[in-house]
Amino acid sequence: MIIADTNVVSEFMRDDPDPVVIAWARTVAPADLSICVVTVEEIERGLGLLPAGRRRGELEGRWRDLVDTFADAVVVYDLPAAQETAAILVAAQTAGRPMSLADAQIAGICRSGGHELATRNIDDFATVSGLALINPFQE
């Protein structure tokens, strides 16, 4: 299974999404693509911080459509993911390359479940051993 990072999900919500990302998504079987609860939190927090208005309403509508699409494919943050997250954060800090909690949680979910991560931010995850990365923004 491939988990789409928040930057990939937000690309799907854009007025004019990157055609390379759309082409990549079309090559992935729907049953093989999912999102995780951390992305749900990040997107909903971002939407909640936008000023009320037309733009926010449009994005919220697109988000609802995506949530409906992924409703049965949202990967949760569980005990194994939390344990992987702790190990990832320790390794990153020890190596002098601290990472955000959200990124570490996404990586922990992926690593504990054996999932690949589709992200634009390859460098943010490059030091996480045992994590397969895909950049859907590159041809």
Segments (PLM) and residue ranges:
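Short, well-structured N-terminal submotif of metal-dependent ribonuclease cores
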Residues: M1-T39, L47-D65, E139
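Acidic, PIN/NYN-like endoribonuclease modules and their adjacent C-terminal/linker elements
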Residues: A107, R111-E139
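Histidine- and aromatic-rich ligand-binding microenvironments
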Residues: D5, C36, P98-S100, N121
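Active-site neighborhoods of divalent-metal-dependent phosphate/nucleic-acid chemistry enzymes
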Residues: R45-G53, D72-A118
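Alpha-helix capping/helix-boundary segments
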Residues: V8, T39, A81, I106, ...
